[in-house]
């Protein structure tokens, strides 16, 4: 099992499928508004497209097109884990995820924050030290109106 949440990973789906034909990819989907606001708030200094709203929307559009292509081409390759569903029902969602990965589930899957051996150097470093929380759901709704003029041309932004 390998975990990497680099924002550019979707570019390598073809290579991953070719090198590791049995690989499983977990595509964590989040409300696009929440993802875009998170990118803007976290100042991703080394990510060139993350500093301009139009570039962020274009990048997301490319991401959705590429993910959808691979999901249609290889139905058992990519699992969509809806972030908000996972926050609301972590046990059932983690069971489905583990089943997709052909792994057995146990309660420790929900107790990841108790582990001392997990290392993270990302904006999520605090999140892995705490239980799953729901306070980020809908907190970005007040910004939706500001982003509508950019997102209206994309069917994934609603």
Short names for language-model regions:
Residues 11, 31, 92:
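Short, well-structured alpha-helical interface segments that form or flank functional binding sites
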Residues 16-41:
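Conserved phosphate-donor/acceptor-positioning beta-strand/loop module used by diverse small-molecule
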Residues 1, 36-80, 87-158:
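PAPS-dependent sulfotransferases, especially Golgi type II membrane carbohydrate sulfotransferases
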Residues 4-6, 26-29, 81:
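Generic beta-strand/beta-sheet core signal
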Residues 7-8, 32, 85-87:
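Short, flexible loop/turn elements at secondary-structure junctions
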